Amino acid sequence: MRIGLIEFLLILAIASLTVGPRVALFVDRWMRRANRANAMAARRRAEYAAQMAAERDAMLKRFRTASTVFGVGILLVLVYALGFRPIDTPPQIYKAPDLRQETGALQTAVSTDRKTRLELGEYQGVDCIREQDGFVYAAAYNGATLKKRKSDLVRTDGGHAAAILSVEGELTGFAFDAAGDVWLTQLTTAGGTLCRAKHDSWGAAVEQVVTQLDGAPLGAVSAVEVSPAGKVYFAVAAAAGAENGLESALRTELLAHTGTGWVYVYDPADRSVQRVVGGVAGASGLALSPDGRTLYVSDLGNRCVWSMDADARELTAGGKNCQSAFSGLPGYPGALALDEDGILYVSYRWARSSWLEKNADSTLLRGIALRAGRNLQEKLFSLCLLYT
């Protein structure tokens, strides 16, 4: 049976009236469920975003709190380390020495012409030089730190250079006696030592003579001189620790100004050690007059050179029988030398530090500099020249 167009349209109308409401209801329910699902997903996303934001804010807050606590802790540690940490040599209040007075001293220009220089090979530096029998002797060293340093006593005639002896640590000074033996001041991490060395064409033998005083190790030995009578004068820069070398001990004494440097005399005849003069703020150099009667001592912190009778004992720097030969020097004096005419040569380890002497009455600032370490301390002092 064939269905005509009208019948087909009637069937569609009846089907739409019968099924249409159900389809519409199904679509409506599906759309509502979809909307509810979308709304729930949106709420979950919003809740997740809010939770993440809250966690992020909490983390940032904790980080800021931790950063603040860490910063305050670092600040407190820094304040303690620079201002309150105990140190072996607490700074003392002192009166800064006057500026240089007119003493007739002349600045000596040193030529840099290669013809006037003595080459010592691959050594990194020189601590002390002397002339003996037409040869130049130098205490030359290798090694940046005292623990790894090795020092040689090198002899040269301007051409060939040869090491005649070698010691561990720092060879801070040496001098010859009438017999040609060499007296050495040696500094290691264990302390200072006064040594005697005998040398010939076969080699050298080094003997330790003085290693301690009153049961305590020698401190930072800095210089040695031998009198015509054979007595050996040697200086201990200060009570500052010697484990980092002489230069460190002298810088420490400059900042602390403890006045604990001593000059001693050793008599080989009876092997006795006596104190000559104390109260020196950095005993850094010695010299004897040609007749051996007058002893000169460099006082680093007071920027002066003391003179005294070489036979005197138990003196105090600046006290009775200890006069100032030169005061108000332009730098901090180190090694001394006297020629045959009695002219005194003064070398300077550093130029005068205006900051240091401006704070002579401030133990706080100098204490901070002492605790701050080597790099800052080195910036407070600059190299200086040679005066006669």
Region spans (language model):
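Asp-box/WD-like beta-propeller blade repeats and closely related beta-sheet repeat scaffolds
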Residues: L187-S227, A235-A242, L246-R251
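Residue position within the beta-strands of beta-propeller blades
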Residues: A138-A139, W183-T185, F234-A235, V297, ...
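Beta-strand-rich domains and repeat architectures in extracellular enzymes and scaffolds
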Residues: R114-L146
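Short loop/turn segments that connect beta-strands within beta-propeller blades
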Residues: T156-H160, K198-G203, Y266-R271, D309-R313
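Conserved small/polar residues in nucleotide/adenosyl-binding loops
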Residues: Y387-T388
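A short helix->beta-strand "capping" segment at the edge of beta-propeller domains
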Residues: P97-Q124
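Blade-loop segments of beta-propeller domains
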Residues: N142, K148-T189, V210-L213
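Beta-rich, blade/repeat-based domains predominating
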Residues: R2, G121-D133, V167-Q186, D214-V232, ...
